[in-house]
């Protein structure tokens, strides 16, 4: 498996778009930029299999040899991300179909149904040919399977999917009556007597059965995962030891990242923060989430050197922004930074997506200078490879809950899983408190504090695990509309939140969501804090009121609560707080959980813009100091160390310039 010794630096390379002269110039420029790793052949299917009858590997042979001769490692893709025109012409049944029954034709990308057996047969044939030919090539560092599963096709309603869905359901439930019970089909006369009576949840007159919808989302994720596993198996027939991976997309809803990570040897994701955001917290969150999928270092497989091409306004990254955000990923556990793509395309749908080498081909351009600077710096940081990121706080992240939470017919259609996550994650990031994300099946005992945010769907196993964790002394925070249903979207009876009611010392009688734009307030101590989106009628059953609602029939009633359970404590948020309220509540919980920021560095400014994290190994701590402010800031080291980016020894007060970074190596 992967024996990585250097931080990877490079990007997607698509030499099939360019002349021989430009390709040779690319080798020179890659060396100048300290590129040591590229992804190759991701969209190469039509090039290496121009017709069904035969393969032509001559160009790919040449490229692998050329890259290897120039000291550049290769993440070689099997090329299955975009089926060629000849395949679609011969087998139009491989095309994905919308819920309205419209096939999506060739001329874009990802135009395939993941469950279609014909498509899969051609995928396996191609993958086997690629793996057989290049399994022993010395330049291959990693195998790259497909590309961004479900990025564009997150649903398919073709006949193949319908047949596969019925088989999937039969495997899961065994008996049709079991499905009827789990799907609550007595409601609206939806009961089934035969498996072939079940259709995909296509267009319907009104609200669909949410259990039906939820299983369909599980099915789609599973179909893409089994496709990945089939492609991986084809590679493993010829290559036993080289790692196999694909590029995930961080906060992407439609495939279960934890399930994919179990099958991947290395985890990577494609990071595209919005340049108009000073601190793009969703991307920061996604770095921590991606690392957490395997609790190991990860790779940023794609990011833009500057602008992308697919937003309504595709702003350029300001000077230094790309560098700072790259270090944000490194600070949170990345062992490589890659771009899409090396050279900006001359034509095609992504020609205005920035590249490491721009249309102007000017090596004195700002973008290329920043690319060279980052590559030069990263070449000096190889000792970071494999270092750990440790956290005392865990946030539960569950794709199945995400799917269930955002289905139709909820008390509020405005509950957004990622926004709820982001609101609280932001507080930990600003307080310089490290966070892991965990699957509900993972052990909770490694953490002092566990958050279960908008955890609408809760299994009996997770509920029991939470009870054991708190009884043993853990601290647990959950938020409104959590613990409501089981894995079949059936409500726990006896008062909300049924799965957590005992450990919280409360029950919720009724939800009272607020319309968009309406604000309210709670009283927390002697201070009033703004709330929105949600209120509810909370009854205490042993819990203590921390804050109260201040308006209407809920005036004086609990909004935030605390409860001692066993040796631990639980906290409940019955409303959505603005940032200052979240900050107050989280700081209180951290103090009671005895969780503090890194103790090696003291930040002097009360309103500091410094983000501080630590990676470590058995002998050293590596303190990352990223200044997101517009002015220089000073921090105070508790003991002296080495500044890795310039090699100098530092102690006492250290200044970090605006939009800049320092990495301090401290001996343990």
UniProtKB/Swiss-Prot annotation:
<dbReference type="GO" id="GO:0046872">
    <property type="term" value="F:metal ion binding"/>
</dbReference>
<comment type="function">
    <text>Capable of hydrolyzing the chromogen 5-bromo-4-chloro-3-indolyl-beta-D-galactopyranoside (X-Gal) at low temperatures. pNP-beta-galactoside, pNP-beta-fucoside and pNP-beta-galacturonide are also hydrolyzed, but not pNP-beta-galactosidase, pNP-alpha-galactoside, pNP-beta-mannoside, pNP-beta-arabanoside, pNP-beta-xyloside, pNP-beta-glucuronide nor pNP-betacellobioside at 20 degrees Celsius.</text>
</comment>
<feature type="binding site">
    <location>
        <position position="158"/>
    </location>
    <ligand>
        <name>Zn(2+)</name>
    </ligand>
</feature>
<feature type="binding site">
    <location>
        <begin position="350"/>
        <end position="353"/>
    </location>
    <ligand>
        <name>substrate</name>
    </ligand>
</feature>
<dbReference type="GO" id="GO:0009341">
    <property type="term" value="C:beta-galactosidase complex"/>
</dbReference>
<dbReference type="InterPro" id="IPR013739">
    <property type="entry name" value="Beta_galactosidase_C"/>
</dbReference>
<feature type="binding site">
    <location>
        <position position="161"/>
    </location>
    <ligand>
        <name>Zn(2+)</name>
    </ligand>
</feature>
<feature type="binding site">
    <location>
        <position position="109"/>
    </location>
    <ligand>
        <name>substrate</name>
    </ligand>
</feature>
<dbReference type="InterPro" id="IPR029062">
    <property type="entry name" value="Class_I_gatase-like"/>
</dbReference>
<comment type="similarity">
    <text>Belongs to the glycosyl hydrolase 42 family.</text>
</comment>
<protein>
    <recommendedName>
        <fullName>Beta-galactosidase BgaB</fullName>
        <ecNumber>3.2.1.23</ecNumber>
    </recommendedName>
</protein>
<keyword id="KW-0326">Glycosidase</keyword>
<feature type="binding site">
    <location>
        <position position="156"/>
    </location>
    <ligand>
        <name>Zn(2+)</name>
    </ligand>
</feature>
<dbReference type="InterPro" id="IPR013738">
    <property type="entry name" value="Beta_galactosidase_Trimer"/>
</dbReference>
<dbReference type="InterPro" id="IPR017853">
    <property type="entry name" value="Glycoside_hydrolase_SF"/>
</dbReference>
<feature type="binding site">
    <location>
        <position position="113"/>
    </location>
    <ligand>
        <name>Zn(2+)</name>
    </ligand>
</feature>
<keyword id="KW-0479">Metal-binding</keyword>
<feature type="active site" description="Nucleophile">
    <location>
        <position position="302"/>
    </location>
</feature>
<feature type="binding site">
    <location>
        <position position="310"/>
    </location>
    <ligand>
        <name>substrate</name>
    </ligand>
</feature>
<feature type="binding site">
    <location>
        <position position="147"/>
    </location>
    <ligand>
        <name>substrate</name>
    </ligand>
</feature>
<dbReference type="InterPro" id="IPR013780">
    <property type="entry name" value="Glyco_hydro_b"/>
</dbReference>
<dbReference type="InterPro" id="IPR013529">
    <property type="entry name" value="Glyco_hydro_42_N"/>
</dbReference>
<feature type="active site" description="Proton donor">
    <location>
        <position position="148"/>
    </location>
</feature>
<dbReference type="Pfam" id="PF08532">
    <property type="entry name" value="Glyco_hydro_42M"/>
</dbReference>
<dbReference type="Pfam" id="PF08533">
    <property type="entry name" value="Glyco_hydro_42C"/>
</dbReference>
<dbReference type="GO" id="GO:0006012">
    <property type="term" value="P:galactose metabolic process"/>
</dbReference>
<dbReference type="GO" id="GO:0004565">
    <property type="term" value="F:beta-galactosidase activity"/>
</dbReference>
<keyword id="KW-0862">Zinc</keyword>
<dbReference type="InterPro" id="IPR003476">
    <property type="entry name" value="Glyco_hydro_42"/>
</dbReference>
<dbReference type="Pfam" id="PF02449">
    <property type="entry name" value="Glyco_hydro_42"/>
</dbReference>
<keyword id="KW-0378">Hydrolase</keyword>
